[in-house]
Each structure stands twice: as structure tokens, then as C-alpha cells.
Amino acid sequence: MASFRTLFACVVILCCVLWSSMARYGEDMEVETEMNKRDEGVRCTGQHASSFCLNGGTCRHIASLGEYYCICPGDYTGHRCDQKSG
């Protein structure tokens, strides 16, 4: 019986952690999930290549969608690498 209680407690804790992460990063997670479903695009050119991403991020362009996004260095996050992690 103790192992069932331990398992139940672990499941509850895991659900709480996931729920709080989704509440905090839900919108970003949706965007990342959508991006992961698509190809990674190509490296940006022109003005976007040097100015779209902040804090050392790498700009990517998905031509078929007309969208730009950034691959951020480890200590930044956000659509344009504009938010400091942690």
C-alpha cells in the first residue's frame, strides 16, 4: 500500500509542476510546439538577420508562413530572445 501512496504522491507533484509550468509559459510553449511541427526555416537575411533577434539570438525565417523567430542562447527566451531566463 505504501508504494501506491508514493506513486500517487509523485503523480500529483508531477501534475502540479507541469500545470504551473504551463500557466507560466503556456503561450511560449504553444508557439514552440507549433514551430517544432514545422521545418526550422532558413537563416534570416537582410535587416532581419542583424536586428530581429536580441541578445545574440539567431534569426530564422519560414517563408511559407511569412514568419520569423529566434533561436535563443541558453540564458534568454521569448520570441525575440528578449527575456532573461531564470
Curated annotation (Swiss-Prot):
Keywords: Cleavage on pair of basic residues, Disulfide bond, EGF-like domain, Nematocyst, Secreted, Signal, Toxin. Residues 1-23 form the signal peptide. It is found in: Secreted; Nematocyst. Residues 24-36 form a propeptide. Disulfide bonds join 44-59, 53-70, 72-81. InterPro entries: EGF-like_dom. One of its GO terms (cellular component) is extracellular region. It comes from the Eukaryota. Pfam families: EGF (PF00008). Residues 40-82 form the EGF-like domain. One of its GO terms (molecular function) is toxin activity. Has both toxic and EGF activity. Its EGF activity consists of rounding cells (morphological change) and inducing tyrosine phosphorylation of the EGFR in A431 cells, but with a lower potency that human EGF. Belongs to the EGF domain peptide family. This is OMEGA-stichotoxin-Shd4a. It comes from Stichodactyla haddoni.
